[in-house]
Design a protein with these regions (language model features):
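Signature of the first transmembrane helix
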Residues: 1-29, 191-198
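Short runs within selected transmembrane alpha-helices of multi-pass transporters and secretion channels
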Residues: 31-35, 88-110, 115-123, 144-161
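Alpha-helical transmembrane segments of multi-pass membrane proteins
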Residues: 18-26, 55-67, 74, 78-106, 187-191, ...
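Juxtamembrane "helix-exit" motif on the non-cytosolic side of transmembrane helices
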Residues: 2-6, 74-81, 131-137
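Hydrophobic/aromatic residues within transmembrane alpha-helices of membrane transport systems
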Residues: 41, 106, 151, 190-197
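Transmembrane-helix boundary and interhelical linker motifs in polytopic inner-membrane proteins
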Residues: 29-58
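Hydrophobic alpha-helical transmembrane segments
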Residues: 118-165, 180-184, 191
């Protein structure tokens, strides 16, 4: 799409780099918690303790958002991105933290169709909005496409969270119970992190 609107090659490369670094950094942050949280989910589902699932989702997401946004924000400060680009990257990063975490939960309950539908809707919105912003409204290519991608992944995030609320009941359980599993299965956490870094 960037090529169709006549974007310079360096702009296209910069957009790809921004999105790629944001996706990889968010995946790296979530990879530390992914395996212990998946183990926690499996145990809670086996014990029929579904009321603990949503609180643990928000607890783990909150922890990763605070840690990840702090680190990625510092990276963006020295990355050379301008203020708008940096804010859009940070916004996309925060969405992806929730998205990766939600995928772990949805995968645990084997809702692959829900994941696929949310992904396809995100792609459609990103391309459609990018077309409107850049081609029809004449917005700058880099910022317009980055905003469109951010909106697409935002739709995916909302879709995935709605699916989780359909499957699991809301409750007042502690959102930090999963941390006992992180502590008990710390080698799994480092395995997930090292595997992601290796990839």
């Amino acid at each position: 799409l960037c090529g169709w609107v006549g974007a310079q090659r360096d702009q296209q490369d910069l957009l790809v780099c921004m999105i790629t670094y944001t996706l990889l950094f968010s995946l790296t942050v979530t990879s530390f918690f992914s395996m212990p949280v998946t183990r926690y989910l499996a145990d809670m589902l086996y014990e029929e303790q579904e009321q603990t699932i949503l609180p643990s989702f928000w607890g783990s997401s909150s922890l990763m958002l605070v840690l990840g946004c702090t680190l990625y924000g510092l990276f963006l400060l020295v990355s050379g991105a301008n203020l708008l680009q940096g804010l859009l990257c940070l916004w996309l990063f925060a969405e992806m933290i929730v998205n990766w975490n939600a995928m772990s939960y949805l995968t645990a309950i084997k809702d692959y169709r829900g994941i696929l539908c949310s992904f396809l809707a995100a792609i459609a919105l990103a391309f459609g909005l990018g077309f409107v912003l850049v081609l029809l409204l004449g917005c700058p290519v880099l910022e317009g496409m980055l905003f469109a991608v951010t909106m697409g992944y935002g739709l995916m995030m909302v879709w995935d969270v709605v699916l989780l609320y359909r499957y699991f009941p809301q409750s007042d359980e502690s959102p930090w119970t999963f941390l006992r599993w992180v502590d008990a299965f710390l080698p799994l956490a480092f395995t997930g992190l090292c595997t992601n870094i290796g990839l």
